[in-house]
Amino acid sequence: MLTGYRLMWMVVMFDLPVITKAERKAATGFRNALLDVGFQMSQFSVYLRFCTSQAQVDTLCRQVEQALPAGGKVHIFQFTDKQYERAISFHGRSRQPAQKAPDQFDLF
């Protein structure tokens, strides 16, 4: 059974150089690679993805690693769904409700 302690969230945070045209192209390619594997942009350099298992997190970590540009810093954080639901978010000065995990399908 999937529980909030097995379900995971991944957060990829990065600071990439964008001085030269080649660096901007590499940074855009990295952002697009994150979108291609199902991440959502939370902020310009912060991307989130919901995962159903640690194995899926491990697979996505390898995919992110393969897409890394030559320069810059990239951090990948992993949180259980229970930990992530405690996140506090604001839009301006308005507190936002916690982001919900996507619905799971039941297979018989």
Curated annotation (Swiss-Prot):
Name of the protein described by the UniProt record: CRISPR-associated endoribonuclease Cas2
SUPFAM superfamilies per UniProt: TTP0101/SSO1404-like (SSF143430)
Record flagged with keyword Chloroplast: no
HAMAP family registered for this protein in UniProt: Cas2 (MF_01471)
Organismal lineage: Bacteria, Pseudomonadati, Pseudomonadota, Betaproteobacteria, Burkholderiales
Superkingdom to which the source organism belongs: Bacteria
Enzyme class: hydrolase
Gene Ontology molecular function terms on file: metal ion binding; RNA endonuclease activity
UniProt similarity note: Belongs to the CRISPR-associated endoribonuclease Cas2 protein family.
InterPro entries for this protein: CRISPR_associated_Cas2, Virulence_VapD/CRISPR_Cas2
Cofactor(s) required, per the database record: Mg(2+)
Amino acids binding Mg(2+): D15
Quaternary data: Homodimer, forms a heterotetramer with a Cas1 homodimer.
Gene Ontology terms: biological process: defense response to virus; maintenance of CRISPR repeat elements
Species assigned in the record: Paracidovorax avenae (strain ATCC 19860 / DSM 7227 / CCUG 15838 / JCM 20985 / LMG 2117 / NCPPB 1011) (Acidovorax avenae)
Magnesium in keyword set: yes
EC number(s) given by UniProt: 3.1.-.-
Function: CRISPR (clustered regularly interspaced short palindromic repeat), is an adaptive immune system that provides protection against mobile genetic elements (viruses, transposable elements and conjugative plasmids). CRISPR clusters contain sequences complementary to antecedent mobile elements and target invading nucleic acids. CRISPR clusters are transcribed and processed into CRISPR RNA (crRNA). Functions as a ssRNA-specific endoribonuclease. Involved in the integration of spacer DNA into the CRISPR cassette.
Keywords: Antiviral defense, Endonuclease, Hydrolase, Magnesium, Metal-binding, Nuclease
NCBIfam families documented for this protein: cas2 (TIGR01573)
